[in-house]
């Protein structure tokens, strides 16, 4: 084949002429040689400007360089410049990254001449286009058999975890189903719900089966604790008693605690001791005792509300020179409410004005009878200052513990109670836990309230790292994922997955709140809440009046709310009563009595209302009023207009607009509205704007067409129904 030569002239790019390019085809079909023809103008470097001549020199028409031919390539001159060497190395590295091996390829695309390929020295590697990938995917799908296509269209059966309470939205997400389909299915069963409605576990399990999935019931914390108790062996061992020291702030409670700790140091077991946490252990002969500081009133009330029985013995400190004080009485009430035995320590017996017998007589009013008065309450006369009879006090505690016969399993999964929790810089969340059963070990996974974690470190009351914590031992635990609450339970579980799942379930249940919807409540869109309780504290002048008020209040009955008298006593309203009312959120009633100055001041600071009456009927009316405040209001709904969506439009600056026709009543801008699709309510909110022939309107009547926009909703579909309605709220009474 003869050599052929083709000329290609490119010009007009960026208003600059481009030199002629000569293409020479060699004998090989796949080789193309691109050359630049020599310019008929000499380069600028060939011009000379004499110094004596000011005018422009004549331009030479001959080229100063001879034309290069394709057949005789000019040998490359050696590169001596560092910059050129570095640039050449970068170009070679770029070609290697792009996969350019220097070998000629036979792709048709590379034979196509373009301007960029003509002017550049490198040929960039091209990646596969999206269109090419799409064509390959379609070709692959066409090759599938009919059976394979049907198999791919089958619904996926999933394992769905079901907690005790779950919202419709969350259940739909776990099943990977549309919320509207779930709501529609419930509506077909006669249950009207919203997307945020809470469903009971039984209802959710039924729905999961209806949609063809596999329901998995998640274990409740109570069931886990019960399994732990059932798995405990019969080889029970005695555990140290957990003792709480309570009393009035000026009666030497702190001094007794300090002396007990210092006595333990003198025993020679440790060279020094520092209380790092709010609880500690002491050694008395062969017995260990765990002491915890008096918790705050709110924390103690919270523990009682949770039904936890952390304290085994209460040591009540009473000053022999001062007698029974309000906080002393409060401590007695808390201990009796928790059904915990009391050991009385009559302190400051070294003072001349001390009268221990007077203290014993005062305690008779609160059913604390000393042994020398033919009672069963252990009372010890001590002096924290002189360290008098402290051994007798400890012996009395040990004796009371022996009577209680405190035993537990040391080898089972550990459980405990959180005393306090804090966020420590450098250590993160730290929880102080007292172990009630089992043994906590490093590496254990656990759940505490709504939190979970892995035990990274165990620190005892002396600041020492330990590997395990047996029953009744107080420890600081590092590794929790957040600050737990005082009174939260502490449960060791088998795995991280189990701990995380239980924590998430508890968090989900706390967020949903209220009673979940079951088929028993399918007539209402919202489930009836369990009966609320109104806590009541009654203080009266005489015992007979207190009993009469208590009896009359207990006769007030209602399906949704009930009264609960947590304290009925005689005497004026004290600071103790105000504190208890705040801790338990109770109504405080003073019948024929007045509050003390201290109680009145505390009530003002804590915003606690002290209601004073002298007629029983007025008390009952007040209780009914407070109970009525706990009832949900009666909401009456009236539909004022409906509209059918005919078309959906997109308007710039507004978004999606539902082109609708009013079929009944009137549609008013700003009115409450809901969207109904296939019988299921998918949205409830407000009407934002109404358009009438591109103008905004306040109201559209029956038979007219309009455009409607809703607040925070754009998922319109044809044939949806928009219902505008009004509600009237009426307070309910007991």
UniProtKB/Swiss-Prot annotation:
Region (Disordered): 39-110
Listed Pfam families: EF-G_D2, GTP_EFTU, IF-2, IF2_N
UniProt xrefs under SUPFAM superfamilies: Initiation factor IF2/eIF5b, domain 3, P-loop containing nucleoside triphosphate hydrolases, Translation proteins
Keywords tagged on the record: Cytoplasm, GTP-binding, Initiation factor, Nucleotide-binding, Protein biosynthesis
G2: annotated span: 272-276
GO cellular component: cytoplasm
Binding, GTP: 247-254, 293-297, 347-350
Chief location bin: cytoplasm
Any GO molecular function: translation initiation factor activity
Function per UniProt: One of the essential components for the initiation of protein synthesis. Protects formylmethionyl-tRNA from spontaneous hydrolysis and promotes its binding to the 30S ribosomal subunits. Also involved in the hydrolysis of GTP during the formation of the 70S ribosomal complex.
Protein name per Swiss-Prot or TrEMBL: Translation initiation factor IF-2
Organism from which the protein derives: Pelagibacter ubique (strain HTCC1062)
Gene symbol of the encoding locus: infB
């Amino acid at each position: 084949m003869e050599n052929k030569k083709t000329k290609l002239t490119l010009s007009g790019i960026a208003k600059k002429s481009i030199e002629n390019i000569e293409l020479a085809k060699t004998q090989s079909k796949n080789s193309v040689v691109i050359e630049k023809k020599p310019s008929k103008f000499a380069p600028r470097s060939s011009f000379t400007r004499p110094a004596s001549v000011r005018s422009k020199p004549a331009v030479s028409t001959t080229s100063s360089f001879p034309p290069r031919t394709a057949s005789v390539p000019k040998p490359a001159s050696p590169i001596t410049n560092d910059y050129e060497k570095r640039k050449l190395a970068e170009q070679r590295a770029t070609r290697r990254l792009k996969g350019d091996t220097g070998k000629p390829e036979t792709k048709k695309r590379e034979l196509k001449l373009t301007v960029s390929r003509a002017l550049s020295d490198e040929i960039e590697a091209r990646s596969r286009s999206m269109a090419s990938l799409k064509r390959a995917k379609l070709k692959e799908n066409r090759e599938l058999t009919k059976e394979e296509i049907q198999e791919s269209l089958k619904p996926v059966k999933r394992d769905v975890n079901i907690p005790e309470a779950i919202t419709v939205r969350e259940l739909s997400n776990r099943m990977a189903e549309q919320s509207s389909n779930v709501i529609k299915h419930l509506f077909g069963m006669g249950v009207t719900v919203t997307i945020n409605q809470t469903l009971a576990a039984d209802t959710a399990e039924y729905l999961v089966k209806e949609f063809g999935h596999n329901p998995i019931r998640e274990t409740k914390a109570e069931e886990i604790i019960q399994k732990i108790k059932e798995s405990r062996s019969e080889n029970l061992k005695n555990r140290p008693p957990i003792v709480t020291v309570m009393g009035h702030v000026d009666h030497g409670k702190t001094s007794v605690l300090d002396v007990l700790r210092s006595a333990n140091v003198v025993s020679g077991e440790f060279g020094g001791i520092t209380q790092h946490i709010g609880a500690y252990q002491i050694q008395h002969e062969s017995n260990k005792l765990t002491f915890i500081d008096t918790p705050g009133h709110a924390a103690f009330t919270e523990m009682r509300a949770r039904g936890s029985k952390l304290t085994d013995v209460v040591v009540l400190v009473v000053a022999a020179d001062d007698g029974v004080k309000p906080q002393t009485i409060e401590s007695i009430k808390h201990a009796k409410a928790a059904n915990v035995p009391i050991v009385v320590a009559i302190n400051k017996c070294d003072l001349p004005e001390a009268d221990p017998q007077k203290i014993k007589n005062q305690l008779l009013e609160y059913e604390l009878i000393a042994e020398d008065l033919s009672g069963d309450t252990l009372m010890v006369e001590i002096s924290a200052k002189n360290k008098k009879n402290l051994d007798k006090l400890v012996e009395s505690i040990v004796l009371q513990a022996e009577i209680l016969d405190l035993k537990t399993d040391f080898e089972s999964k550990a459980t405990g109670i959180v005393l306090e929790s804090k966020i420590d810089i450098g250590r993160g969340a730290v929880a102080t836990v007292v172990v009630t059963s089992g043994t906590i070990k490093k590496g254990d996974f656990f759940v505490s309230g709504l939190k979970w974690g892995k035990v990274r470190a165990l620190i005892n009351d002396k600041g020492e790292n330990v590997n395990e914590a047996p029953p009744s031992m107080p420890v600081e635990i590092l590794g929790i994922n957040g600050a737990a609450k005082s009174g939260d339970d502490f449960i060791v579980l088998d795995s991280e997955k189990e701990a995380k799942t239980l924590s998430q379930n508890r968090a989900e249940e706390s967020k949903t709140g209220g009673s979940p919807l079951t088929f028993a409540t399918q007539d209402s869109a919202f489930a009836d809440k369990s009966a609320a309780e109104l806590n009541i504290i009654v203080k009266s002048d005489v015992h007979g009046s207190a009993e009469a008020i208590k009896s009359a209040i207990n006769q007030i009955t209602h399906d949704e709310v009930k009264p609960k008298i947590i304290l009925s006593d005689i005497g004026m309203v004290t600071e103790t009563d105000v504190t208890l009312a705040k801790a338990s959120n109770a109504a405080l009633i003073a019948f024929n009595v007045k509050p003390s100055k201290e109680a009145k001041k505390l009530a003002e600071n804590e915003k606690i209302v002290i209601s004073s009456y002298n007629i029983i009927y007025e008390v009952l009316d007040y209780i009914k009023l407070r109970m009525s405040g706990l009832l949900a209001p009666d909401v009456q709904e009236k539909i004022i207009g409906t509209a059918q969506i005919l078309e959906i439009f997109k308007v710039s600056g507004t978004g999606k607009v539902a082109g609708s026709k009013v079929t009944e009543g009137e549609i008013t801008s700003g009115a409450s509205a809901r969207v109904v699709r296939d019988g299921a309510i998918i949205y409830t909110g407000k009407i934002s704007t109404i358009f009438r022939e591109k103008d905004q309107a306040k109201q559209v009547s029956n038979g007219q067409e309009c455009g409607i926009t809703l607040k925070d909703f754009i998922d319109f579909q044809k044939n949806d129904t928009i219902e505008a309605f009004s509600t009237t709220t009426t307070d309910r009474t007991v």
